[in-house]
Amino acid sequence: PTVAYAQEESTESTENTDTLTPDKKPATTITKQINEDVYQVLDFDDTQEEEFAKKGFITAPDSLQITDDDGNVVWNMDNYDFVRDADSPDSANPSLWRNTKSNTNYGLFQVSDDIYQVRGYDLSNMTFVRTDNGWIIMDCLASSDTAKAALELFKSEMGDIHIVAVIISHAHIDHYGGIQGVLTQDELADSSLSLDEQIASGKTAIIVPDGFENAVMSENVFAGTAM
């Protein structure tokens, strides 16, 4: 099949490229065929992934538009209505389209006992873990505006919380960029203390992987534009 596709593609290489414009164009015949073939490979009657995506749902606003202090929209899930309200077009892989639909489920979810997530408020999820000493936040989204909104949603159901620590899993911006949306400088624990001492101080420890600062700098220099 790969050879057949390649041969057919060569005869259609100019099918939709006669005029290079930003306007939407129909899928080529080969693209349609490849995407249609996905229906023969995967069981689209299996809705388990959709059920998983909705499992544990607690609450969400009817519409999700997050703005900054100046009223500028920084995150708008309404922009993805075209995915939720339509079947996969012939220009898209139907499995990826279905996966994208699942990703439009936003709000507060319970993952398991004492573990919650705010989903769809940014590129990544914000996870809350209840401990004996307070709450741990795992990853704090890409911007302070989205992180603040996610924390407010969580508090609307769980009440005011003491954040004992923020864990940043890795050096991509959507996992650390929103730190100022969940913490102020005055709330930070003294990083020169041991972790136990930071927790005992009543302030919030920030826990990152070894080499985090170097990874942040190097990844943004080499891959920041592409990402």
What are these regions (language model features)?
Residues 133-134, 144-207:
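Active-site metal-binding motif and surrounding structural segment of the metallo-beta-lactamase
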Residues 8-100, 104:
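N-terminal pre-domain segments of enzymes
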Residues 8, 18-30, 179-222:
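Internal hydrophobic scaffold segments of catalytic domains
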Residues 31, 96-104, 151, 212-227:
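Charged, low-complexity, helix-prone segments enriched in Lys/Glu/Asp/Gln
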Residues 101-161:
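Conserved beta-strand hairpin/beta-sheet module of binuclear metal-dependent hydrolase folds
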